[in-house]
Amino acid sequence: QPYVELGARARAADNENATSGLLYSIANRVSYVCGFTGPSLAVDTACSSSLTALHLACQSLHTGESDLALVGGVNLTMGETKSHFLAKNNFLSSDARCRSFGADGTGYVPGEGVATLVLQPLAAAQAEGRNIYGQILGSAINHGGKTNGYTVPNPKAQSALIQRALDKAGCAANRIDYVEAHGTGTELGDPIEINALTETFRGSGSSCAIGSVKSNIGHLEATAGLAGIIKVVMQM
């Protein structure tokens, strides 16, 4: 059964261990066991959760609040309630196949997974002889604001966000040759994402490939962003 239900029942029974099943305990249990004393928080921004956590971790490193950060995500399907909801609202692929940016895409396929990245300032990582698999030059987060629907993305906001991340990274659009996209395989979301990318890269004078790990392992929802980063690092 979903842990949220177990937690609710335990609290109702006045069980002192009820806190172990709440969202915040995911991060704070790690800090407790490992003896970490820096910021410890669980982030819930739906499908962008793990990337939002990554952004917040970068900020903590930039300000000197932390000298090393663990950014993790986990997505497990513990019951059938979510599947019923997604099917009822036509979110799911009709044949259980995720076709990111495919003309015959009919919806997304939920996936399960766990992902973790270790972040550290570059100079410190080099001084300590760490294995460095990638470098984050810039990150940004925003919200789509008012759109045609609560779950409908805003291409203008997406384009502005991409441009802001490029600006923070000091990187021109024509230097980008691959984008790991959200690419859920939905008829609504994929075209909007393509429009946002087109707006950002129009006039750059170069071509840019796009892809999404969701066609390989499904949509890891809260963990999807980290899964995409790990894919890119592994294919470099």
Task: Kindly give the residue locations of the regions a language model identified.
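Condensing-enzyme catalytic core of the thiolase-fold
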Residues: 1-236
